[in-house]
Amino acid sequence: MNKFLFFIFVFVGISFAGDDTATKDYDIVWRTINFAIFFGILFYLIKGPIKNAYNARINRISSRLEAIQTKLKESKEKKEASKKNLEDVKQKCVELIETAKKEAIQLDEKIQQSAQIDIAQMQKSFAEQKEFEIRRLKKSVTAEILDELFNEKSVNLSQNELINLVQKKVV
C-alpha cells in the first residue's frame, strides 16, 4: 500500500512538473524528482537487508542477554546450593564436635575405671605380697631362733621359756 501511494505521488509530481507554465530554464525540478525516484528505489532495495541486519543484531543481543540471564540464574542456584551445603557442613561439624566431646568423656571414664581397677589389683597384690613376706620372715626368724637354740647345748631352757623367746622375736 505504501509503495502504491509512493508511486502515485511520484507520478502526480511528474505530471505537475510537466506543466507548461513552469519555466523551462531550470532543471532543478527534474533533478529533485530523479533524486526522489533514486532514493525511493535505493530505499526499496536496501530496506530488506538493513532490516534483516538490524533484526539479526537484535536477536544476537537478546540471545546474549538470555545466555547471561541463564548464567546468572545458574550462579544464583549454585550460590543457594553452596549456602545450603555450608549450613549442612556447619551442622555436621557441630554434631562431630559434640560426638567427639562425648567420646572423650567416655574414654576418660573408661581410662579412670581401668586405672582404678589396676590400682585395686595392685593394692591387692601388694597386700598379698606383704602378707606372704611377713609369713616368710616369721618362718625364717623362727627357724633361725630354733637353730640357735638347738645348736647351743649350753643353754637349757624350758619349753615355756622357748615359747616366750620365740614370741618376743616374732613380734
Curated annotation (Swiss-Prot):
Ranges that cross the membrane: 3-23
InterPro entries assigned: ATP_synth_b/b'su_bac/chlpt (IPR002146)
Record keyword Transmembrane present: yes
Keyword set, alphabetical order: ATP synthesis, Cell inner membrane, Cell membrane, CF(0), Hydrogen ion transport, Ion transport, Membrane, Transmembrane, Transmembrane helix, Transport
Disulphide bond pairs: none
Pfam family, one: ATP-synt_B
Membrane topology: Single-pass membrane protein
CC per GO annotation: plasma membrane; proton-transporting ATP synthase complex
A GO MF term: proton-transporting ATP synthase activity, rotational mechanism
Subcellular location: Cell inner membrane
Annotated family: Belongs to the ATPase B chain family.
Role description: F(1)F(0) ATP synthase produces ATP from ADP in the presence of a proton or sodium gradient. F-type ATPases consist of two structural domains, F(1) containing the extramembraneous catalytic core and F(0) containing the membrane proton channel, linked together by a central stalk and a peripheral stalk. During catalysis, ATP synthesis in the catalytic domain of F(1) is coupled via a rotary mechanism of the central stalk subunits to proton translocation. Component of the F(0) channel, it forms part of the peripheral stalk, linking F(1) to F(0).
Classification via HAMAP family: ATP_synth_b_bprime
Stored NCBIfam families: PRK08475.1
Quaternary structure, from the entry: F-type ATPases have 2 components, F(1) - the catalytic core - and F(0) - the membrane proton channel. F(1) has five subunits: alpha(3), beta(3), gamma(1), delta(1), epsilon(1). F(0) has three main subunits: a(1), b(2) and c(10-14). The alpha and beta chains form an alternating ring which encloses part of the gamma chain. F(1) is attached to F(0) by a central stalk formed by the gamma and epsilon chains, while a peripheral stalk is formed by the delta and b chains.
Protein name: ATP synthase subunit b
Organism encoding this protein: Campylobacter hominis (strain ATCC BAA-381 / DSM 21671 / CCUG 45161 / LMG 19568 / NCTC 13146 / CH001A)
Gene behind this protein: atpF
